[in-house]
Amino acid sequence: MTKRKKVVWSLIAIAVLILLVVCAYMVSVPKLNIVYEVDEHTYYQSSRSIFRHEIQVNGYDQVSNVLLNDKALYATAQKGGHRYFLFHDEAADTTISVPDDDHAFSRIYASFMYNGRYTVEYEYADGEEETKRMLVSIDFENKERISIELPQQVLAGRIVSDGRRIFGSDKDDIYLLNEDKSVKRITRGSEVISVEDEVLYYVFNGKLCQYDLNAQTNSQVQNGPDLLEYDLIDPDSFYTVQNKYFVGCRLSVFAYSDSHSFLTYTTIYDLQHGKKYLFMGNLGRIAENFQILNAD
C-alpha cells in the first residue's frame, strides 16, 4: 500500500470514528420534538436529528409565533407585505386568516392560548406615539381581533398563560392576573418563563426557579442551568421549560447576521436527572420561541 493510500484510509477511518461517536451521542439525547424560530421562520426538528423541517402554510411567508394543537396550527404570517393571524386545519386542509392592523411599527413577542383563543403579546406604535403593549386574542369564527389591556405589573417582560390566568413581572416581582382581572403578587422574580401543571417557572437572581401555584411555595430548580449564561433580550424568548426539560439558545457576540452567530448553540437540560445535552442540529443559529411538543 502506497503512502498516499495509507493517508486516505487513515482519513476515512477517522471520519467513520467521528461519525460513530456522533451517532452514539445523539442516541443518548432525550427524544424530544422541538419547534423553534430562526429569523421569523419556524422549524420542527427532533432532538436526535441534524435535519430540520420548515413549517409552511400555502400562500404565506414568514410563518412564526406557531402553536400546534393536534392537527391544527395557529400562527402569524406575511402575505403581500401584510401580517395575518392564521388558523390552519391540516386534516381539512383549510386556512382561516384574520388581517392585522397596519401600524407604523408592530411586533409580536409570544403566543399562547388564553380563554380558548390564540393570543399574542403585542407591541405597536403609530407615528410619534410611544409604543404600547397589550394582548391581542383572535376570534377566528368571527374574524375579529380582540385587544386586551393589561396592568403595568405584568408588562415589564415576558408574559405566559395557563389558558385562564396571565403571569408576568415588573422586573422585581412576579404577578398573577386572575380571571376576574384582579392582580396578585406571588413571589420575587425578574422574568416568567412558562407555566404547566400548576407550576410556574421563572427567573430569580439568574437562577431557574419554580412556584407551586397550589401549595403557594417556591424553590430553585436544583438541576437547572445558570440563566446568566443565556441572554434574554427583553422580552424575546431564547429559552423555555416544558415537560421537565429546559431548552435554550446560548448566544455569542460573534454574530454575522440577524439569525446566525459563531459559537452560538442550543442546549437541552433534563431537569429531573441533571443532565445536559447539545442540540446538534442547531449549531450557529440564533433560535427563539422554543416549544417542546412531547418527551418520549
What function would you assign to each model-found segment?
Residues 4-7, 66, 70-72, 116, ...:
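N-terminal cationic leader/targeting segments used for protein routing and processing
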Residues 68-69, 79, 83, 89-100, ...:
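Generic signature of mature, soluble extracytoplasmic domains
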Residues 33-45, 65-78, 113-126, 160-169, ...:
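Short beta-strand elements that form the blades of beta-propeller/WD-repeat-like
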Residues 19-35:
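Membrane-interface motif at the C-terminal end of an N-terminal transmembrane signal
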Residues 189-196, 200-213:
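Eukaryotic tandem repeat interaction scaffolds
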Residues 61-70, 103-114, 152-163, 188-198, ...:
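Repeated scaffold domains used in trafficking and secretory/extracellular systems
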Residues 39-61, 81-101, 130-150, 173-187, ...:
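Surface-exposed loop/turn elements that mediate protein-protein interactions on large endomembrane-trafficking
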